[in-house]
Regions:
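Cysteine-dependent hydrolase recognition
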Residues: 1-191
Length: 191
């Protein structure tokens, strides 16, 4: 699914092609991923806890940027995702606020080849730590599937039970494909 219809507001926008267009949405679109009234109530309670004074802390000043290495498409720009993430990180950090910016860029990690395929030592544990220590935003730029981030499987739905940040809920932003299949009612994916 795409939110382009709702987020591209100019009359001349909407014919997006990665080769010919540099259009950016004018307004961010979000949704509550619920299917039942009980899920909606639970989400509302979570938001109320988040907005309460008990939820305040230094973790709300932290942004974590995670960038894929664009493997296996080595003929393309391998640091494309790092450049995209870094551009956003610079904008967040340039106002001289108390914001802390941390980076988990896959290009910076050693590669391990195993029977399971290509893996990057430490990325998965660093991502889990980023969530668990608390961050206002964790922003991922890169490849993704319905239940996994990156070809190297740096984070999967099976990792979600390892998260212990219920009292420090993170806004998880992903610039990837297939991850939040809100338009597929047969599967819950990450949406």
């Amino acid at each position: 699914g795409s939110d382009d219809f709702f987020g591209l507001l100019d009359e001349t926008e909407g014919e997006w092609s990665p080769q010919t267009s540099s259009e950016r949405i004018d307004v961010g679109i979000g949704r509550f991923p619920v299917n039942t009234l009980a899920q909606a109530r639970g989400l509302m309670q979570k938001i109320q806890r988040y907005e309460s004074a008990e939820s305040l802390g230094d973790w709300r000043n932290r942004f974590v940027f995670v960038a894929d290495d664009d493997f296996p498409e080595v003929e393309r720009n391998r640091d494309l995702h790092a450049l995209n993430a870094d551009g956003t990180a610079v904008e967040i950090d340039k106002n001289g606020t108390a914001t802390r910016v941390d980076k988990i860029y896959m290009l910076s990690y050693p590669v391990e080849n195993s029977a399971e395929g290509r893996r990057l030592a430490g990325v998965r544990s660093d991502m889990i730590r980023a969530f668990n220590e608390g961050a206002l935003v964790v922003n991922y730029s890169g490849h993704g599937g319905q239940f996994v981030l990156s070809d190297e499987k740096i984070f999967t739905v099976d990792d979600v039970p390892l998260l212990t940040n219920a009292d420090r809920p993170t806004i998880f932003v992903t610039a990837t494909c297939q991850l939040g299949r809100y338009d597929d009612h047969e599967s819950s994916s990450w949406a």
